[in-house]
Swiss-Prot record:
Protein name in UniProt: Replication factor C subunit 2
Location in the cell: Nucleus
Positions of post-translational N-acetylmethionine modification: 1
GO annotation terms (biological process): DNA repair; DNA-templated DNA replication; positive regulation of DNA-directed DNA polymerase activity
Sequence positions that bind ATP: 71-78
Ranges where the record places region Disordered: 1-27
Free-text function comment from the UniProt entry: Subunit of the replication factor C (RFC) complex which acts during elongation of primed DNA templates by DNA polymerases delta and epsilon, and is necessary for ATP-dependent loading of proliferating cell nuclear antigen (PCNA) onto primed DNA. This subunit binds ATP.
Biased composition, class Polar residues, residue ranges: 1-26
A Pfam family: Rep_fac_C
Quaternary state and interactors: Subunit of the RFC complex, an heteropentameric complex consisting of a large subunit RFC1 and four small subunits RFC2, RFC3, RFC4 and RFC5; the RFC complex interacts with PCNA. Forms an heterotetrameric complex with RFC3, RFC4 and RFC5; this complex has ATPase activity but is not stimulated by PCNA. The heterotetramer of subunits RFC2, RFC3, RFC4 and RFC5 interacts with RAD17. RFC2 also interacts with PRKAR1A; the complex may be involved in cell survival. Interacts with DDX11.
Amino acid sequence: MEVQESGSGSAESGTQEPSPVPSKTTGHYELPWVEKYRPVKLNEIVGNEDTVSRLEVFAREGNVPNIIIAGPPGTGKTTSILCLARALLGPALKDAVLELNASNDRGIDVVRNKIKMFAQQKVTLPKGRHKIIILDEADSMTDGAQQALRRTMEIYSKTTRFALACNASDKIIEPIQSRCAVLRYTKLTDAQVLSRLMNVIEKEKVPYTDDGLEAIIFTAQGDMRQALNNLQSTFSGFGYINSENVFKVCDEPHPLLVKEMIQHCVDANIDEAYKILAHLWHLGYSPEDVIGNIFRVCKTFPMAEYLKLEFIKEIGYTHMKVAEGVNSLLQMAGLLARLCQKTMAPVAS
């Protein structure tokens, strides 16, 4: 991935690394950057433009249905709902919005007590506006709580709207889905994550290298929250963003090591490939960490297309076995053996 350099913030490859800049967090508490730079308006949200434009229509017209926003973590689901509530309610936001995290408040008592009591409260709002109940991680709610919520949504439909954020909409019962407009968010692209990172870097005056930004984007995998947390953690710990510092903070198998291991497999050199695997294993990385990074590196590895297909098929098969609980070093070594076998010259009989 190409990363554009920006003024004095970046460092040319080959230049001497500057001495670490002491973090601004020293000596006093600083707000996490995830909260500090959380968008407050819908047009500030990065990515998922089509879905956000639908929310902007809701905000303009004021007639909001119950909504479910489903998508991966760190894509802006909860932030979008809060921006919508702010656009609709303005100064009344504090009194007219109840925000609950359903992964904590997941039982039927929450629906019967907190949600029902809030829905019954009288709040003075502009004409055509409704109170909003935000349920984050709604797919963690028990079936009993969801059944109780269905009836509550019907009874208080004249005064209250429900906004649910979840990772998987299929874990929300059908009766609730049928009462809501379902909006889907996708993972953010590398370019979208990079644009927001550069915005924060410029405001916080963070020194960085291109490979450091690539490392943050690689570890984030389309999760903006993860990217900003990794950026702040690396800056707080080292005062300088480069790939070495990022992987010290994130502590996952280094993609350069994984890339070298895949190259040995392409060269059918099982001994050297196994040495790298054993090294990663002895560092304490789990099979899930290793197999996940093997897949992510393999996707962009320069090799023949037919070979890449064969490699990914074997990686997927091994990932399935690891997920089933067969997560020994022998299982991972078997993957390397099968990958090497794909590129070995046939033995003459």
